């Protein structure tokens, strides 16, 4: 059984005395030990091989057993949501004679001991759905010894909104610590037999433009247990959302650092078991290893399961909670809104006159930034200097676009070959920082291999030193990096509005309504999402979404810099009430509430900044939808932007009590904001 001396608090609170830490009950030859929400079941004649750790409320639990390899199971008060699933690693190393040694850490493990503690964390984010966070959970660390002498620890945590675990390999043996290890395979899998539906997104086959987490998700849901069809992708992307009775499970990872690669779900799903796997060999044009190489001590990323009702899924910050805390000064980091010329005119980034129009638009709308996209380096030096001066006069910060390559891609858009070499990168950052540039957009990453993950992190570190905000495009997915590096304000990794301008089958316009209603439950749960929303221009003739739908995306989508991507004339033509809404939209939120919705069909979110609330509702379906809402937490008159009486743009002022029932037309939406800000 556990010794209470191994238990501790991490929030600075007083360590409880052993008598209060553990209550032991002897019953029919078993000791039952309750310790910080952990139930340890052990025989009086043998070492324990069964453990349970609970959230503080007891509503969420992880069972662990080790009688036939390490396995875990996750349950809520409604029942099992993830059935018994395998854990384990296989590592290898080379000695000085280049002899290969394999360490199987998936079976034949001998239990050594364990520790429990309450983990509490209080932190403030610069961007996101909830800036101030104070979170407590219970942790159980199980320590094992492998048959070949290498130790393995597995840390399990249970919070109110989910559970997580990670592998830890460390040793006091100097010789072993000096070796270079390779992660041969990870046995982590998730038995989702209890689930009834899954909402997967294919993981791209690697090519000159992918992977980029931009494949269309199956927004209508899919049967649990289906392998990835070859024509759709090379596996399933994370995050992955499952419906399990009254509960939901969103699987993801957090705390990814340079010691590992980015994971996704393997294409073969057997008996409803979804297995983690690593990058594809031909990612980054074949450069770099597909496995992870590291020295000890080593910690894997956290394997995260956000669990509960849809409100818990959408409102969760568990991915950020599990990420390493920030170590940089972030006082200078400012979230904001930006104009963006490229979507409406792909060549505009080479035209200083067009770029000036978008700087002026940002100033008129009260936005903070304007993005100058690919090939801006072709602008003559004098004209570029004039653009910088004009933006400074208007108090608009500029973002500049860069190619991440390097040998990792063959995309010719420029500037390129500046981000992959650290010396060149830092020199460029120093140069543009001196020019007053506020941020960078770095595009076309195309790989989750370890060397590319390290490049992301090195770039964030260098950018922070020169006080540059960062936007990653054509990139991997968020994994809590915006907590560790607060200058990371947004990431793409979504099939966003730029796809309106691309030829594809089916066209993005057909997919957009349901995709828009899905990503608030999946992609945008895990971190900021640069979908570049809110398009009104009629020239995008394939757009099915209404004006109200597009307007509501400004609330429904969370991004530390929200890029409004329509042409200048489209925004200037809006009625004053609509302009006031776009001018007022916050870019970082104090609170987010899920009010109603179902993945791929519809969603209603309320977000608070200070004492004021904004509400966004969208319908992803071709049928109208009537909604009953409780806005009793909102006070004061609200302006409602909607699609009423056949008018593309309509507005009215209502009291919150009058908004208990709203109607969304097919593919429609409603945006609601405080009247006092007009």
Where in the sequence are the language-model features?
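Bacterial N-terminal signal peptides
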Residues: 29-40
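N-terminal accessory beta-strand-rich subdomains and adjacent acidic, glycine-rich linkers
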Residues: 49-319, 637, 647-650
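Edge strands and adjacent loops of beta-rich recognition modules
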Residues: 131-134, 584-605
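An acidic-aromatic substrate-binding cleft motif
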Residues: 295-365, 369
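Aromatic- and carboxylate-enriched substrate-binding clefts and catalytic-loop regions
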Residues: 371-546
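Catalytic cores of secreted or luminal carbohydrate-active enzymes
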Residues: 548, 552-592
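Carbohydrate-binding surface patches
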Residues: 598-634, 667-673
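C-terminal beta-strand-rich structural cap/linker in extracellular carbohydrate-active enzymes
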Residues: 653-678
């Amino acid at each position: 059984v556990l010794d209470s001396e191994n238990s501790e608090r991490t929030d600075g609170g007083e360590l409880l005395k052993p008598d209060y830490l553990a209550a032991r009950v002897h019953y029919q030859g078993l000791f039952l030990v309750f310790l910080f929400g952990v139930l340890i079941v052990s025989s009086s004649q043998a070492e324990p091989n069964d453990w349970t750790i609970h959230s503080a409320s007891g509503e969420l639990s992880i069972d662990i057993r080790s009688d036939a390899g390490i396995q875990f199971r996750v349950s809520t008060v409604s029942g099992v949501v993830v059935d018994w699933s395998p854990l384990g690693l296989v590592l290898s190393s080379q000695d000085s004679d280049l002899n290969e040694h394999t360490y199987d850490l998936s079976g034949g493990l001998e239990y050594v001991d364990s520790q429990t503690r309450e983990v509490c964390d209080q932190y403030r984010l610069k961007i996101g759905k909830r800036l101030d966070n104070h979170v407590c959970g219970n942790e159980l660390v199980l320590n094992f010894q492998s048959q070949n002498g290498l130790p393995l620890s597995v840390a399990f945590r249970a919070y109110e909104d989910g559970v997580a675990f990670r592998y830890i390999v460390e040793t006091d043996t100097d010789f072993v610590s000096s070796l270079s290890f390779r992660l041969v395979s990870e046995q982590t899998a998730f038995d989702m037999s209890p689930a009834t539906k899954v909402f997967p997104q294919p993981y791209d086959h690697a090519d000159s433009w992918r992977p980029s987490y931009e494949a269309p998700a199956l927004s209508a849901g899919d049967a649990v247990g289906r392998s990835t069809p070859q024509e759709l992708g090379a596996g399933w992307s994370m995050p992955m959302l499952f419906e399990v009775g009254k509960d939901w499970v969103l699987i993801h990872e957090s705390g990814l650092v340079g010691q590992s690669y980015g994971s996704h779900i393997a294409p073969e799903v057997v008996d409803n078991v979804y297995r983690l796997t690593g990058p594809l060999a031909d990612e980054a044009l074949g450069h770099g290893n597909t496995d992870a190489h590291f020295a000890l001590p080593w910690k894997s990323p956290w394997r995260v399961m956000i669990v509960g009702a849809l409100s818990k899924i959408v409102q969760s910050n568990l991915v950020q909670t599990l990420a390493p805390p920030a170590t940089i000064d972030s006082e200078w980091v400012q979230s904001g809104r930006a104009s963006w010329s490229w979507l409406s005119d792909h060549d505009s980034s080479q035209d200083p006159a067009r770029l000036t129009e978008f700087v002026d638009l940002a100033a008129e709308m009260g936005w903070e930034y304007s993005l100058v996209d690919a090939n801006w380096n072709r602008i003559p030096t004098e004209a570029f200097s004039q653009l910088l001066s004009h933006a400074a006069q208007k108090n608009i910060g500029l973002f500049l676009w860069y190619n991440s390559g390097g040998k990792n891609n063959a995309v010719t858009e420029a500037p390129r070959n500046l981000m992959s070499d650290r010396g060149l990168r830092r020199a460029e950052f120093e140069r543009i920082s001196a020019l007053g540039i506020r941020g960078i957009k770095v595009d076309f990453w195309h790989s989750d291999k370890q060397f590319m993950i390290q490049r992301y992190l090195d770039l964030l570190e260098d950018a922070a030193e020169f006080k540059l905000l960062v936007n990653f495009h054509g990139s991997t997915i968020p994994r809590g990096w915006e907590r560790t590096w607060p200058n990371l304000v947004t990431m793409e990794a979504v099939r966003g509005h730029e796809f309106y301008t691309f030829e594809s089958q089916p066209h993005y316009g057909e997919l957009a309504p349901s995709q828009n209603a899905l990503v608030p439950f999946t992609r945008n749960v895990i971190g900021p999402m640069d979908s570049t929303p809110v398009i009104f221009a009629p020239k995008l003739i394939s757009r099915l979404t209404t004006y109200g739908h597009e307007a509501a995306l400004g609330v429904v989508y969370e991004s530390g810099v929200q890029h409004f991507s329509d042409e200048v004339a489209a925004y200037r033509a809006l009625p004053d009430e609509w302009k006031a809404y776009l001018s007022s939209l916050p870019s970082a939120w104090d609170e987010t509430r899920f009010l109603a919705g179902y993945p791929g069909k519809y969603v209603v979110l309320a977000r608070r900044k200070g004492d004021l609330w904004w509400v966004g509702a969208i319908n992803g379906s071709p049928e109208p939808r009537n909604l009953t809402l409780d806005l009793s937490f909102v006070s004061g008159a609200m302006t409602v932007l909607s699609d009423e009486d056949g008018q593309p743009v309509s507005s009215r002022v209502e009291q919150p009590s009058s908004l208990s029932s709203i109607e969304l037309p097919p593919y429609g939406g409603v945006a609601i904001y405080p009247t006092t800000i007009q």
